[in-house]
Each structure stands twice: as C-alpha cells, then as structure tokens.
C-alpha cells in the first residue's frame, strides 16, 4: 500500500533552523564537553557521595544536588565554579536492562544535538551538561553508594516502581547546570537566586481541519485548551464531591494565555498558576519555586518574605509578592532571545515552543489515528497486525540524524505533502516540546533583578507511547463532553495566542 498523504493547510510563522543553525561550542544538555572559555574536567573520582542529596526525579532520571559540608564554595570542587554549579543527573533503568544502555544514552545525546538544539535555534537556552564516563568497578561502587544514600528520600511511589538507578546498566552519568543554585561571585561569596519552574503545556488550539469531521471532539478541541480539558477530566476522576463549576473552570490556568504576546493575558495566566500553587499547597505540577536551590513551601512565610525583599516588595501586604513576581515573570517570558533564519529578528522562548508544538502536530492525534487506520486497519495508533508490512518509521523512533532532515518540511513550508511516516515521527517530537519545563532564574545585579530562561525535560518520547497518547486524548475529551452536557451554559472559550 502506498504511503498515506496529507496536505498541511496552515501558514508557518517562521522557517525551520534545522539546516542553518550553528551548533554552540559550549556544551549543553546532554552533550560531551567541547571547547569552552573555562573548560572543566569531571570524573567519578571527584564525587564524594556524602556531598550529594536527592533533588527530584522523572520517569527517566534522578537529579541530585550538590550539598557539601560548609556550603558551596566556588573552586573547592569541579562541581562548583564561578560560572556554574552542577547537579548530577543519573539515568534510571528497569531490571531487564542489566547490560549497559550506552546506545540509548548516545541516542539521547544525538536527539538533543541534531533535533532539539537546531529547532530551538540557540543551544544556550539549554542548561550546560557534561558526560561523566563510568569505567571501573570503583566507579560503579560510587554510583551504588549515591543510590543507597538517596533511596529513602525518593517519593514512595517512585520507590515502588522497578525503574531505579542501576550502576551495572550505566555507561555515563551527567553533570548538569543547577539553574536553581545560588550564583557565585567569589570563592566564598554568593548571590541569592530565585528559580521559578513553569511547565507551560500546550500553547495552541487544534485546527478544525486537522480532525476527522466524524469526530465528536472537533468543536471542543478548537475552542478549549487541552490543559483545561485535562483538568476537568482529572477532577471528575478524583474523589471530589460534586463536579467542577463553570467559575472554577474559568479561573484555571490557561496555557494559551501564557503563550500570548498580550501582557495582560500573560499576567492572567501567571496569577492563575500562583493561585493554583497556593491552593494545592505547592503540589501543583505546573509551578514550583526554588529559593537558593531549595524548593519553596507556599506556607513558609519566612522564605516568602525573603523572596519578597529580593524582588523589592513586602509580603506582609496581601498580593504584593504575587504582583511583583508576576511582573518579573511577564518581563522574562516576553524577552525575544531566540533568533530566526532572519538574523535581524528574534522571538521569545514561548513563541518558539508554541510554533514547534503546533507545526509538528498538524493532524492532532485523532487525525493521525485516522490515517493510521487507513494504512494498517488498526484502530490503535502505533500498533498493527504482524502480517502488515510497515517501514521503520511506523514501528519505532527514527535515529536523530534521520529526524533532522525530515522535520524541515514541517517547519519551512517548502513541501506540500508529508507522508504518514513523517507525520508520526514529527508528532513524537512535538510531544517533547509539549511536555518540557521552563526554569526562569533571577538574581541581583548592580542594575537590579536580572532573569534568564532555560528549558529542561526535552527527552524524546518513545514510539510505544503513541497508543497511550491516543487513549488519554479519548478519555479527556469524553470526560469534558460529559461535563459540558451537565452545564446550563458553555464556559468561556480559550483564545488562541
């Protein structure tokens, strides 16, 4: 059967940087060290397990922060320099992977080098990162000691899952820039740092023409942001008494407001994130604050007052800290720092993210599943009968080097037709940008509070996740339609950025 074709019907706001981007000589997540102004060499022998503590973890990695006795002093350790303090990122693995997963680690690096960096257009928006080889039995013993040291600090749900640090499966770990750590200004002095983590989510609304006309979800996907619909679904599935009200829904954080170029809408989104952070006592997944590397509890009045003073305001007056933080976040999120093909023009990080998310997902998961059904006779995206002969692009993730050339057609507008194979692979890349996090770091300078933005959690999404993405989409839409059917009026729609 010949490849199924579709024809994109949208305009792209700027061209891809796949072919023209220049790779930075500074090493960035997660790449081998290159030529730098201040080269640093780090090995496992530099790691003292007693100097590290658990910081966070995701599905693939555990993050440890540097916490030596007496505090961090630049120059005393290769993990703390005048230009950067490093954390450790250690990949997790399952019991079945007792052998080294070196190929997986190398492909992850290639995904960043050949896909993520060129698409973003500027490698410096990614945290610095160095590969630390694991070679000897002693190296593995150090990893085992680190793992044992932090095991009981991990959340219970993570400890019960079989994925964990397994030294026998590691070829490398990584020293990554700790964006939340204080800024060193001398070997013994540091400046305070406020780091705000935002998980912005999807910055676009689906186009009506991307979804099969027979779908019951056409209107809701074109009117309401995916994040808000998902919140309704989660609320319905939780043990809450009663359903979410229209008023509650309209107060929810809406990503398309954050991605908007309109300052008023952006500030509305930031305030909604703050309110959710307060209401959930810091348990929300979309906003976290770090003060000098430590996560902030919204009930910690002492730390909140220190942050307020740092931002030049007073937390004793209700709403002032929220207002000051909103202003700083709005300013930082609006900065045009990423270059386009036109060397004279730049865009904000959020604008680039929104474009990549939407341009690489022109069909929506429903449109993609519709073409998959026509091609394979399977209703489950990513799965097909064993007697159906499929090319590699419809059975697994393509290598990063292959992806790079293929993605250009989605972003440049130079190709009228794109194959199903390409659409599936581009959809997976889009999912990486939909699920990333932003780290906004603020520190004091002589001219006042200055900010910078880094992007993290940009790992490739596995091909095997396609079916669960389709299922989640179906469940979210069904729950949202059920909720709408019980209302006496329609809630206010999202407004595209």
UniProtKB/Swiss-Prot annotation:
Keyword Nucleotide-binding appears in the UniProt entry: yes
E.C. numbers: 2.7.1.158
Catalytic activity: 1D-myo-inositol 1,3,4,5,6-pentakisphosphate + ATP = 1D-myo-inositol hexakisphosphate + ADP + H(+)
Keywords (A to Z) from UniProt: ATP-binding, Kinase, Nucleotide-binding, Transferase
A GO biological-process term: inositol phosphate biosynthetic process
UniProt GO MF annotations: ATP binding; inositol-1,3,4,5,6-pentakisphosphate 2-kinase activity
Gene Ontology cellular component terms for the protein in this record: nucleus
Region (Disordered): 1-23
Pfam short name (any one): Ins_P5_2-kin
Top-rank lineage group of the source organism: Eukaryota
Motif segment (EXKPK motif): 197-201
Class of this enzyme: transferase
Keyword Transferase: yes
Disulfide bonds: none
InterPro entries to which the protein is assigned, alphabetical: Ins_P5_2-kin (IPR009286), IP5_2-K_N_lobe (IPR043001)
Function: Phosphorylates Ins(1,3,4,5,6)P5 at position 2 to form Ins(1,2,3,4,5,6)P6 (InsP6 or phytate).
Record-stated family: Belongs to the IPK1 type 2 family.
Domain notes: The EXKPK motif is conserved in inositol-pentakisphosphate 2-kinases of both family 1 and 2.
UniProt protein name: Inositol-pentakisphosphate 2-kinase
Organism of this sequence: Mycosarcoma maydis (Corn smut fungus)
Gene: IPK1
């Amino acid at each position: 059967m010949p490849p199924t074709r579709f024809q994109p019907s949208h305009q792209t706001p700027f061209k891809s940087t796949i072919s023209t981007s220049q790779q930075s000589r500074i090493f960035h997540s997660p790449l081998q060290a290159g030529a730098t102004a201040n080269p640093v060499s780090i090995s496992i022998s530099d790691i003292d397990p007693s100097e590290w503590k658990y910081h966070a973890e995701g599905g693939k990695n555990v993050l440890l922060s540097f916490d030596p006795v007496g505090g961090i002093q630049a120059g005393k350790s290769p993990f703390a320099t005048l230009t950067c303090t490093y954390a450790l990122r250690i990949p997790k693995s399952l019991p079945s992977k007792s052998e080294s997963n070196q190929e997986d680690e190398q492909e992850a690096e290639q995904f960043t080098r050949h896909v993520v960096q060129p698409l973003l257009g500027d490698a410096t928006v990614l945290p610095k990162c160095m590969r630390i080889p694991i070679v000897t039995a002693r190296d593995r013993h150090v990893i085992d000691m680190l793992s044992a040291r932090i095991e009981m600090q991990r959340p219970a749900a993570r400890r019960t899952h079989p994925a964990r640090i397994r030294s026998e499966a590691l070829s490398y770990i990584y020293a990554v820039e700790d964006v939340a750590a204080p800024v060193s200004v001398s070997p013994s002095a540091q400046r305070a740092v406020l780091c705000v983590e935002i998980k912005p989510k999807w910055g676009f609304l689906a186009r009506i023409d991307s979804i099969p006309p027979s779908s019951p979800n056409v209107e809701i996907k074109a009117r309401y942001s995916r994040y808000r619909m998902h919140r309704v679904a989660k609320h319905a599935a939780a043990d809450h008494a009663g359903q979410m009200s229209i008023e509650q829904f309209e107060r929810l954080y809406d990503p398309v407001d954050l991605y908007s170029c309109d300052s008023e809408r952006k500030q509305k989104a930031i305030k909604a994130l703050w309110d959710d952070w307060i209401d959930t006592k810091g348990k929300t997944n979309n906003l976290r604050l770090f003060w000098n590397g430590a996560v902030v509890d919204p009930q910690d009045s002492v730390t909140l007052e220190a942050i307020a003073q740092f931002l030049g305001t007073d937390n004793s007056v209700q709403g002032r800290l929220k207002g000051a933080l909103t202003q700083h976040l709005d300013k930082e999120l609006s900065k045009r720092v990423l270059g386009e093909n036109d060397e004279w023009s730049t865009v904000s990080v959020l604008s680039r993210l929104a474009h990549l998310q939407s341009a690489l997902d022109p069909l929506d998961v429903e449109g993609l599943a519709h073409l998959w059904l026509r091609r394979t006779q399977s209703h489950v995206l990513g799965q097909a009968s064993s007697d159906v002969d499929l090319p590699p692009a419809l059975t697994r993730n393509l290598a990063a080097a292959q992806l790079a050339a293929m993605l250009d057609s989605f972003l440049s507008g130079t190709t009228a037709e794109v194959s199903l194979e390409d659409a599936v692979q581009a959809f997976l890349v889009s999912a990486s940008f939909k699920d990333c996090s932003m780290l906004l770091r603020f520190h004091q300078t002589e001219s006042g509070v200055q900010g910078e933005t880094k992007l993290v959690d940009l790992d490739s999404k596995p091909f095997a996740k396609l079916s669960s993405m389709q299922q989640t989409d179906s469940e979210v839409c069904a729950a949202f339609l059920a909720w709408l059917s019980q209302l006496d009026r329609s809630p206010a729609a999202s407004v595209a950025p």
